[in-house]
Amino acid sequence: MVKATLFFAMRIRYILRMPPVARLLASATFPVLVLFSSCGEAPGPASAAKDPGAGADTPEPATTAPAPPKPESPAGTSSPGQTTVPAPAPPPSRYRPRSIGTPSAGSTEARSVADAPSPEAKSSKEYHTVEVFYGTNRKPTGFREANEFYGTERHREGPMQYGKIHVSIPLHHTVGVVERPKWYKLEFSEDPKKHVMLLDLETLGKDAFFEAVDTKTAESPEHEALLFIHGFNVSFPSAIQRTAQIAFDLDFHGTALAFSWPSQAALEAYTVDQDNAIWSVPHLSRFLVDLQEKTDIDAIHVIAHSMGTRVLTQALAQARDEGFDLKLNNVILAAPDIDADVFREQILPKISGVADRLTMYASSSDTALKLSQTIHGNDRLGLGGTFLKTIEGMDTVNATDIDTSLLGHAYYGSHRLVVRDLLNLVVRHLDPPR
């Protein structure tokens, strides 16, 4: 009853926040309106169907999904169309003295973090392109299109798949936004000039993958890599799109990577996602170990969101248990959907020291975590306010006052102030003020 009430309340609130014309259309079609919560991202039109190729033969290891025609990419093209971002709201408040510094609105650092694309975000006359390397334990569907290449099933015959994808970022991209087709704008197909979309996909063998990652990272100024791990209710394309958006908005000059586990990309599949998250722990653990041992990357930054923080923290603990000495630079837990007591008593002691800096973002406006807390019956680590957990050895950032999304769960990559916070932490290597 609680979930049903919350479900319809969210839809009503969603409609009320629409423009008048869109609100009228949405009201007329309310029975069939599908809400993609901020736990995940709405898949593109080509990826809406769930595993239509389930059971199909696994594609050949070395494949390239077709790409739409891309314009010539003149070297050195600048980014003239960046959207001007309004003056920011007050920065996130901190509950601990050791917290990430946020410049004031009047400082030079208060500008858009995407004023210019990084060298890894190549520009064309019509859109930017970000290269994302990925590891996944999702089963290939048998389809050749990039949006449909991986589905929601576990890939038990491997299990890991590797590859790289080019992702478009519009010239007029807004910081914190994954631009997608909007039905109320009568957009029913993807356009790289307007949307963050997968342009192509190339699968790689394991050795070729880590060699390519090493080569790519060696070309960057500081030999760094940024790994993103998504949470509940996220499709493979959405995970890659979010990775590209974060890397672009952070002006990250290193290698962008994503680890995508088999989330069902469905609100009603929470328990299935939980099982798949736990199943993915050893695969992520091995991926992190290989990333350290098979490359010469100097610094690895990891951002995990929601249920993905369970996969990450348990993977780090498993690597320690197996005798691997992982050394990461930043580990960022965004809105962690983890039992707070389990984290404090069982996980943190095992992962202490694995990263130079461990940071958590929390919000008491996080409706998704409130629902998770109702389901589990215990406090969630990522709830702020009265639920906020300040733990020795971890910086805690209270993001309650700055999130304006429907469920208050996607602020880690969608709010400009948090993006700027991550910029200071990951790219500028600023220590938290003491």
Task: Write out the residue ranges for each language-model feature.
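Bacterial signal peptide processing site
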Residues: 39-43
